[in-house]
A protein has these predicted regions:
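Conserved glycine-rich cofactor-binding loop
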Residues: 20, 27-29
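Active-site helix of classical SDR
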Residues: 138, 174
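Substrate-binding pocket helix/loop in short-chain dehydrogenase/reductase
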Residues: 88, 113-115, 122-124
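Conserved glycine-rich Rossmann-like NAD(P)H-binding loop of the short-chain dehydrogenase/reductase
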Residues: 43-57
């Protein structure tokens, strides 16, 4: 049963004070909004993404609005590897000495075409970014997360990762895999109770990926990423302590009040 919390949730200003959170795909869209929201609620944010220019812009915004200490980590998850993830682990430990949360937001859409016509190279690329990279990064960071008293890992899902639909190819399959990864990791960490793991389906949101998937859709009819930040903050912060292995939908939430 999908997880649910009060849509009127209002996070306190210091919700994430003293915490360190990694956000992948932090350069724009939902990742950018989440990184800003986390920093504005006290977290030191590790900004990971493919385009350094975009990450630097988010870094500058965080520095202008908060007293937190963000860092920029340019990384193309199409090339995610065990060695690269180990380097990330050591960089975070060296810079902060801790890690309290990970938002796996980065993802590739891939072609909107049938399985019969889906290019194998595109399939492998989408699966690597959306599934393999999330596994590789999470695996490398588990020692840090396990040292936190209250760590949170949030995987980004999709409606087509819960019910398959034609023409969604590797993207849909990758999100089914992400849901499975979430459930397995949540079950593995439940007994110790130090790391909680959930998935979040942002739904129809005004992002570049949504525009690519639905080019004829009017983006003004969709909520901007900031409208979903109450749920992103809830899952990353201590108010969701003890909630793990759940599937959340942003459509069930309203903006923080």
């Amino acid at each position: 049963m999908p997880g649910k919390a009060d849509g009127a949730y209002t996070p306190r200003a210091d919700l994430l004070a003293g915490r360190v959170v990694l956000v992948t795909g932090a350069g724009d869209g939902i990742g950018r909004a989440a990184a800003l929201a986390y920093a504005e609620h006290g977290a030191d944010v590790v900004l990971l993404g493919r385009t350094e220019r975009k990450l630097e812009a988010v870094f500058d915004l965080i520095e202008s609005r908060t007293e937190t200490r963000p860092v920029v980590v340019p990384a193309d998850l199409e090339h995610a590897s065990e060695d690269a993830a180990t380097i990330l682990y050591h960089a975070i430990r060296r810079e902060y000495g801790r890690l309290d949360g990970v938002l796996h937001n980065a993802g590739l859409l891939g072609p909107r075409t049938s399985i019969a016509e889906y290019p194998v190279s595109d399939w492998l690329e989408v699966m690597h970014v959306n599934v393999n990279a999330a596994f590789i990064v999470t695996r490398a960071l588990m020692p840090l997360l396990g040292e936190s008293d209250d760590a949170s890992v949030v995987f980004t899902s999709s409606g087509v990762g819960r019910r398959g639909r034609a023409q969604w190819g590797a993207y849909a399959v990758s999100k089914f895999a992400v849901e499975g990864l979430m459930e397995v990791l949540a079950d593995e960490t439940a007994r110790a109770g130090r790391v909680r793991v959930n998935s979040l389906n942002p739904g129809a949101t005004r992002t570049a990926m949504r525009a690519a998937a639905y080019p004829d859709e009017d983006p003004r009819a969709l909520p901007p990423p900031v409208d979903h930040m109450g749920l992103y903050l809830y899952l990353m912060g201590p108010d969701s302590r003890g909630i793990t292995g759940q599937r959340f939908d942003a459509a069930a939430w309203s903006s923080p009040r």
